[in-house]
Curated annotation (Swiss-Prot):
Its main location: cytoplasm. InterPro entries: Pantoate_hydroxy_MeTrfase, Pyrv/PenolPyrv_kinase-like_dom, Pyrv_kinase-like_dom_sf. 3-methyl-2-oxobutanoate binds at D49, S50, D88, K118. The active site is at E187 (proton acceptor). It catalyses: 3-methyl-2-oxobutanoate + (6R)-5,10-methylene-5,6,7,8-tetrahydrofolate + H2O = 2-dehydropantoate + (6S)-5,6,7,8-tetrahydrofolate. It holds the Pfam family Pantoate_transf. Pathway: Cofactor biosynthesis; (R)-pantothenate biosynthesis; (R)-pantoate from 3-methyl-2-oxobutanoate: step 1/2. Its cofactor is Mg(2+). This is 3-methyl-2-oxobutanoate hydroxymethyltransferase. Catalyzes the reversible reaction in which hydroxymethyl group from 5,10-methylenetetrahydrofolate is transferred onto alpha-ketoisovalerate to form ketopantoate. Belongs to the PanB family. It is an enzyme of class 2 (transferase). It comes from Rhodospirillum centenum (strain ATCC 51521 / SW).
Amino acid sequence: MSATGQSKRLAVPDIAARKGREPVAVLTAYTVSMARLLDPHVEVLLVGDSLGMVLYGFDSTLPVTLDMMIAHGAAVVRGSSRACVVVDMPWASYQEGREQAFRNAARILAETGCAAVKLEGGEEMAETVDFLVRRGIPVMGHVGLTPQAVNALGGYRARGRSDAEQAKILGDARAVAEAGAFALVVEGVVEPLARAVTEAVPCVTIGIGASAACDGQVLVSDDLLGLYGAFTPKFVRRYAELGPVIEEAAATYAADVRARRFPGTEHVFAARKAS
């Protein structure tokens, strides 16, 4: 604790040091209000490009822009004081080359105040990861089911069911880790492969639809809270069902308005009495 009584914000080295220790809890956040609610309870707040589907109604993450990620990343940093904030690099903001990746990653860090960026890809992105890390930009990698490559992968299906696919993903994980990533999201792979990746790489692994053996876990908060109804992946556990609660509150409010029960006298300002 600091002299002011506030806990210090967790930094990239704090997360990296959790390898093989107490698992790291990660949740997504896109707004100030959600960041404030989640911040005391998790080690990492991930501003994921999943916001494109959850907040904007896109059918994939591909339409998400750099400006969107920066706006939401800055909001989450402002709304938090403890968690390490990581911001996704959106599709086409880093794949062109390492110089493009550096320019956009540097802009994300400078304009949001976040601690690190996350990018998807395996061996083909190792050079870019190395380029960023050597220039002071911490990187969280992402292998396995990579949503930005959904068109090339042929949809959202579990990866690593064949020997060839397992070897490819394991090689991707090693390449990104050796390039200097401090953490690695392992998404949508068969459980034994996620366990093997965790054992093979020196960096923290964060599982999502992977394995309890990973060094941490991440979920999309709207999935966890029952707020995203488009579909529920197999790997999601709903810890609350807030959708019906919100619907009931809205319906009750609307009924009170129509019946003139709201606002009541306690919600309006009385005129001052003349002195």
